[in-house]
């Protein structure tokens, strides 16, 4: 039997062994094959990374912005050249199908492209005359060492909306990727190095609690970007803020989709199937609840269940597979527990994800509950799995009121051709990202990404202009030039 490879941290431009003696298996969730082992690193590892990044910041922050942008452009080119390999790594680590993995790679590349626009993004502004012979100018500067804590569900896209922008703007970076999906990160490092990145600018430390707390507490780390669950995200925001760091924390979701009587049902059902069961439901933009008007509810449910029954489940590397596994055995058990809870609390199970799935990996099939109510656990909790709840409503107003009862407010979608309904939805729904006649309202990199309420803690969102503000600080220079006598 071949020896399982143990991964190393990437610090100061080198792959270095962690100080830990604790390693965890990285498993292909579709086959249960052990791919490698990842170190559960120590505070000592974070200390080394933070000091390295702080030292590198002294020179990297002074590098001309166009030169930094050229390195990001080189990185974008290399990512594009290796997109199939990157997608393959995502599929074997995360489980999503090849098409979805390629889509994620594309979104990651898009974020790098946006970051490569740093010369424009870093520009300040000025006013030639604020008083007699006095002018003022506003300059942007990098903030320092930044820490990023990324989840397993988008191992390329999420880190790529963190470190490329931060680095392009002159910061140095320490990434803690998910210990469940480290191989993709290893490839990103390899390509970024080839793009010309100097030592110490980008560092990777694998791990769990000690690494997270090290990032939250180290005085050299000035800002933290987090994506993950609500309990951890709330802790990250509180602890980071307590230590006087700038923090953005993108957390849980329970996204509602509203279907009105005038919706094109074929198109609507196709979009909802993709939104609810794509990436095995393990995404913060997944459709978790559908509220459908009573007039079309029966027809909608018939089409929805039929479409769900046609979904091909299996290894994401196999042709035609749409739904891959959830990430680990614990996630599967948790999901099965929610299915049982839904039955016990009175929801009607119309598509049972426990049936017709193999035990070879951590598979759960498309699961649909009808006649769900807002007092049920499956409506309240973020399940993060291919489980969809359906509620029948009288009208749009009731649907919006139901959605607004959720503690989460990441995204919401509406299917209709009625412009008045669209306006009402836009003005009254509590959510940060809205979709009209589409299933997943994730915006492009140049728009901010994140929600409201318990889906986000902080003031500046990821991506868009918010990300530029998050990773920079401003310096205002007011200058007086006494009028010369040129006579």
UniProtKB/Swiss-Prot annotation:
CDD domains: ALDH_F6_MMSDH
Keyword Membrane: no
Pathway annotation: Polyol metabolism; myo-inositol degradation into acetyl-CoA; acetyl-CoA from myo-inositol: step 7/7
Keyword match NAD: yes
GO BP terms: inositol catabolic process; thymine catabolic process; valine catabolic process
EC number of the protein: 1.2.1.27
PROSITE patterns: ALDEHYDE_DEHYDR_CYS
Active-site positions on this chain: 284
Alphabetic keyword roster: NAD, Oxidoreductase
Annotated residues for binding of NAD(+): 150, 152, 176, 179-180, 229, 251, 382
Catalytic activity: 3-oxopropanoate + NAD(+) + CoA + H2O = hydrogencarbonate + acetyl-CoA + NADH + H(+); 2-methyl-3-oxopropanoate + NAD(+) + CoA + H2O = propanoyl-CoA + hydrogencarbonate + NADH + H(+)
Gene3D superfamilies: Aldehyde Dehydrogenase, Chain A, domain 1, Aldehyde Dehydrogenase, Chain A, domain 2
Sample GO molecular function, one term: malonate-semialdehyde dehydrogenase (acetylating) activity
Pfam families in UniProt: Aldedh (PF00171)
Subunit structure: Homotetramer.
Database matches in HAMAP family: IolA
Family: Belongs to the aldehyde dehydrogenase family. IolA subfamily.
Function: Catalyzes the oxidation of malonate semialdehyde (MSA) and methylmalonate semialdehyde (MMSA) into acetyl-CoA and propanoyl-CoA, respectively. Is involved in a myo-inositol catabolic pathway. Bicarbonate, and not CO2, is the end-product of the enzymatic reaction.
PANTHER family: MALONATE-SEMIALDEHYDE DEHYDROGENASE
Protein's recorded name: Malonate-semialdehyde dehydrogenase 2
Species of origin: Bacillus licheniformis (strain ATCC 14580 / DSM 13 / JCM 2505 / CCUG 7422 / NBRC 12200 / NCIMB 9375 / NCTC 10341 / NRRL NRS-1264 / Gibson 46)
Organism taxonomic ancestry: Bacteria, Bacillati, Bacillota, Bacilli, Bacillales
